[in-house]
């Protein structure tokens, strides 16, 4: 009996990834899932990966619309979460073309976390309870105006992660 169970592990980076995979006539550009997505291979996101719940939600919808059976996505609870306000801050930063950021919120999220204004993946399942305060904290950190549409989309994406994908691994051993 073969007990081989493949798993793609992403150990760093974030949704700026854009690796294209092709298998049996199907093609997909991955940003959250790993390169085994078309083969049904689950992806594990290590604690150093930046996640954007909205990107995960949107990529899932694209995979489903392409008729792909979406494999599991395991997310370390310590992954740093990119909020819509991080994305806005990145895109508004006049140094975007000089600091190497791609405008996906990773640079702003990194800087925010470095300043101890954190939002980790372990909070996503509790978005109903904590998202308003967390988003206000991030919004204030970046000195941005409230955007209800983006906040609602963020909460919807966090709820999707919690209820539909059952992606969280409890524990921090990886």
Where does each model-flagged region fall?
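Non-transmembrane, aqueous-exposed alpha-helical and coiled segments at domain scale
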Residues: 1-174
